[in-house]
């Protein structure tokens, strides 16, 4: 990509796009493997059906599930979280950083 003038790249595994719930969870479970690409990884799990369907809820009521999976993504090496609910995501990142730096 760099040989074609593309320098600002990130990996977005595309949670929710053309995948079953099971495939999305497997992708998240194995997402640490994306670190081998040596590029920042963006995780977009906010309000995804894999969360609210698993919890038998609705997108707007599944914030705790989103936060739990955000923590998993961070622990697996994600660099960027794409979110709808900024304050709870920032709390998650702050707790992750405290854990990582302890």
Locate the predicted segments by residue.
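Active-site-adjacent loop and "lid" segments of alpha/beta metabolic enzymes
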Residues: 3-7, 18-102
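Active-site metal-binding loops of divalent metal-dependent hydrolases
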Residues: 15
């Amino acid at each position: 990509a760099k040989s074609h003038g593309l320098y600002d790249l990130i990996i977005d595994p595309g949670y929710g796009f053309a995948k079953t719930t099971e495939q999305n969870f497997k992708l998240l479970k194995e997402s640490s493997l994306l670190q081998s690409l040596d590029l920042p990884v963006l995780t977009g799990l906010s309000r995804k059906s894999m969360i609210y369907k698993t919890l038998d809820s609705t997108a707007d009521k599944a914030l705790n599930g989103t936060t739990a999976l955000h923590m998993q993504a961070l622990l697996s090496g994600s660099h960027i979280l794409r979110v709808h609910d900024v304050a709870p995501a920032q709390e998650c990142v702050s707790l992750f950083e405290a854990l990582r730096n302890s």
